[in-house]
Amino acid sequence: MKGRRRRRREYCKFTLLLALYTLLLLLVPSVLDSGSEQDKGGRDCPGLQRSLGVWSLEAAAAGEREQGAEVRFQAEGNPDRSPRPQGNLSAIRESVTQEKQHIYVHATWRTGSSFLGELFNQHPDVFYLYEPMWHLWQALYPGNAESLQGALRDMLRSLFRCDFSVLRLYAQPGDPAERAPDSANLTTAMLFRWRTNKVICSPPLCPAAPRARADVGLVEDKACESTCPPVPLRALEAECRKYPVVVIKDVRLLDLGVLVPLLRDPGLNLKVVQLFRDPRAVHNSRLKSRHGLLRESIQVLRTRQRGDRFQRVLLAHGVGARPGGQSRALPSAPRADFFLTSALEVICEAWLRDLLFTRGAPTWLRRRYLRLRYEDLVWQPQVQLRRLLRFSGLRTLAALDAFAFNMTRGSAYGADRPFHLSARDAREAVHAWRERLSQEQVRQVEAACDPAMRLLAYPRSGDERDVKTVRKGETPLETNANWAT
């Protein structure tokens, strides 16, 4: 009897072990498959361009996003009309729109972006920064423009939140005036072009300034330097937080798609103004200021897209040599002209990529994007200024209207100081390339930039539209520039 009970217990144990073993055999392949998929996902992370190309993340929530965007659009178009309640999501969006507005002016070198940025700098409701990413490019030279795009985006995120501590990472160890006397904190003197910043060069940061912040007019850099002692960046951060609109202008971001994570951030409330200019006029202006743009052009040429083609050229001239290698001085013309021309090819490719990118963008993103041509801005400064202010949520000012008009009706093109902002002759600025570029130079630019030129409605030299343009003395306005655009 006892033997029978013992055998029964052993049989039950054996059955239980067999069941557990079978279950384990079933679970092991599933666990292994799950682990391999995770490893594969970690090794094969989709790139930004592939992730954004079909806008799949937006499509998943298209209905609710588009509905909220429509409500916001209707409210902006008719302030007296109360939008229909849309639940918690609508409340979140409403709170975001009441927060700060952030604007990024997306441009490239010699497109007139300093003038466009100055319109924001003059507005009393705007806190404006001029090319803060200059510090990053200088600190990491000779770098790769493409590989620096992520760092530029992260810097933008911090600066838009009025956190300037990121600038310490790229500060040059030099002038003691750039540091506060009581600490290691940086001061406003380290900022690129700080002497023309309206916030830095007016009260309360500069009590002795001759102009109030609300007065519209260019800041004299020498006068600001003599009357406005540097203040810690913490004080500038405090001023930044007071303004309803923060605008940053820069020329070193080559891919609009890099900004999509910031545009998606509901707490950032970011919009982008992208400025274009006739590539032939850009090339003419770049040649005039070739020595000031040579380092920047080399950074552009070191991108992976053209690395194989141009790396041998750069190394042959000893420019941007690999660590440990011998590096010579920057080349002089005509080799400098070659670098500038080649960099323009990369820039035109970036323009084309951005134009196609925005064409396939969802409605919510297109409403946060404004496309503007320099030629339209200087021929119709007041019309384009009102369009710009409406997009940015800023009030119109008669003094700013007059400022924009007078800045485009100067007496000269300003060739003596190409990096100095002053009133220019709009006609001369638009058409100077026709007299200063050779036929071969024009042909090279048009060959490299033709796809982008066609999308931006710039006629090739010699065709029927171009002949009419020369006869009338102005560039035809872009006909499809009003998709919010």
From Swiss-Prot:
GO terms for biological process: carbohydrate metabolic process; chondroitin sulfate proteoglycan biosynthetic process; N-acetylglucosamine metabolic process; sulfur compound metabolic process. The modification Phosphoserine is found at residue 461. It is found in: Golgi apparatus membrane. 3'-phosphoadenylyl sulfate binds at residues 109-115, 277-285. Gene3D superfamilies: P-loop containing nucleotide triphosphate hydrolases. It is a single-pass type II membrane protein. Residues 66-88, 465-485 are annotated as: Disordered. It catalyses: chondroitin beta-D-glucuronate + n 3'-phosphoadenylyl sulfate = chondroitin 6'-sulfate + n adenosine 3',5'-bisphosphate + n H(+). Residues 34-485 are lumenal. Its EC number is 2.8.2.-, 2.8.2.17. The chain crosses the membrane at residues 13-33. GO terms for cellular component: Golgi apparatus; Golgi membrane. Residues 465-475 have a biased composition (Basic and acidic residues). Glycans are attached at residues 88, 185, 406. Residues 1-12 are cytoplasmic. One of its GO terms (molecular function) is chondroitin 6-sulfotransferase activity. Keywords: Carbohydrate metabolism, Glycoprotein, Golgi apparatus, Membrane, Phosphoprotein, Signal-anchor, Transferase, Transmembrane, Transmembrane helix. It holds the Pfam family Sulfotransfer_1. Sulfotransferase that utilizes 3'-phospho-5'-adenylyl sulfate (PAPS) as sulfonate donor to catalyze the transfer of sulfate to position 6 of non-reducing N-acetylglucosamine (GlcNAc) residues. Preferentially acts on mannose-linked GlcNAc. Also able to catalyze the transfer of sulfate to position 6 of the N-acetylgalactosamine (GalNAc) residue of chondroitin. Also acts on core 2 mucin-type oligosaccharide and N-acetyllactosamine oligomer with a lower efficiency. Has weak or no activity toward keratan sulfate and oligosaccharides containing the Galbeta1-4GlcNAc. Belongs to the sulfotransferase 1 family. Gal/GlcNAc/GalNAc subfamily. This is Carbohydrate sulfotransferase 7. The gene is Chst7.
